[in-house]
């Protein structure tokens, strides 16, 4: 299997994301007003967000999340299976994507469909990605974390540059149909984030229903739910030692980066993210 599928200069996982599907998403897929789109750069808390949104839709009833796999509940639009599922689906759709803005369906930008964009400290994204991609057959294997830091800073990782992904999608942050969430805030005040999502979606949940959403979307419960923990992922795609839900914490990068790596990262971050208001990002 090749290291990546390259499309428009961006590396994508080598399995399940053909160029034809990427072209179709960009040029043919029609976003409907009632769709809800969950956007993230990989390893930013995507599955946690999906779980919370699914539980909000069922008012905390866990039957759906315990009986249907996460990739069937909210298909990844850029995968061949997800795309086929979404174009056949009637009614409102829950859509997941890691796509950069310029490769997403053009129809989104003239639509009132709601978008939730979740971002996470890129240092933690990097460490999580290093462990995740390294234990799959979906991407090129780095020989060390140091190598992966270099690749990440150059955008030579699945879905390309974190910096470009964030800069582009954040251009929508003032729109009424766009909700920006931070992984760090979700960890610190999960209930507050759940309520924020409810408000954005116009969903009114009772206190006991909100408690159920919180309970069934917890890290421990998700880790034990085979519909959400990727235990059902195709075995040829994973290597020994693979674990999808590793630790779900914030600040883990401090246990991995050397001082030199942290300084190199900070330098690139300052350059690439220049122009955003102070306090825009809630991490150190």
From Swiss-Prot:
Q: Which InterPro entries match?
A: P-loop_NTPase, Sulfotransferase_dom
Subunit structure as annotated in this protein's UniProt entry? Oligomer.
Query: What pH dependence of activity is documented?
Result: Optimum pH is 6.5.
Name any Gene Ontology BP term: steroid metabolic process
UniProt name for this protein: Sulfotransferase 2A6
| Keyword Flavoprotein part of the UniProt annotation | no
Q: What is its main location?
A: cytoplasm
Q: Which gene encodes it?
A: Sult2a6
- Keywords linked to the UniProt accession: Cytoplasm, Lipid metabolism, Steroid metabolism, Transferase
Q: Which family does the record assign?
A: Belongs to the sulfotransferase 1 family.
**Tissue-specific expression:** Liver, exhibiting a sex-dependent spatial localization in the lobule of the liver.
- Print the organism lineage: Eukaryota, Metazoa, Chordata, Craniata, Vertebrata
UniProt-annotated catalytic positions: 98 (proton acceptor)
């Amino acid at each position: 299997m090749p290291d990546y599928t390259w499309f428009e200069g961006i590396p994508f996982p080598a399995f399940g994301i053909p160029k034809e599907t990427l072209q179709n998403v960009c040029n043919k897929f029609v976003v409907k007003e009632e769709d809800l789109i969950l956007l993230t750069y990989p390893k930013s808390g995507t599955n946690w967000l999906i779980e919370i949104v699914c539980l909000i839709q069922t008012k905390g009833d866990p039957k759906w999340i315990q009986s249907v796999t996460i990739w069937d509940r909210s298909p990844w639009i850029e995968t061949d299976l997800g795309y086929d599922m979404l174009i056949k689906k009637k009614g409102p759709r829950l859509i997941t994507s890691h796509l950069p803005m310029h490769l997403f369906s053009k129809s989104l930008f003239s639509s009132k469909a709601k978008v939730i964009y979740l971002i996470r400290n890129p240092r933690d994204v990097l460490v999580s990605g290093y462990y995740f991609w390294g234990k799959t057959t979906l991407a090129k294997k780095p020989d060390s974390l140091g190598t992966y830091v270099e690749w990440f800073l150059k955008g030579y990782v699945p879905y390309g540059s974190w910096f470009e992904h964030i800069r582009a999608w954040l251009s929508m942050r003032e729109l009424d149909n766009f909700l920006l969430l931070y992984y760090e805030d979700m960890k610190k005040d999960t209930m507050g984030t759940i309520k924020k999502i409810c408000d954005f979606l116009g969903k009114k949940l009772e206190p006991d229903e909100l408690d159920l959403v919180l309970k069934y979307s917890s890290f421990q419960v998700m880790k034990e739910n085979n519909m959400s923990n990727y235990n059902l992922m195709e075995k040829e795609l994973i290597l020994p030692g693979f674990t999808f839900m590793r630790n779900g914490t914030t600040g883990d990068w401090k246990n991995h980066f050397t001082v030199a790596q942290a300084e190199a990262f900070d330098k690139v971050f300052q350059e690439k993210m220049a122009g955003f208001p102070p306090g825009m990002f809630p991490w150190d």
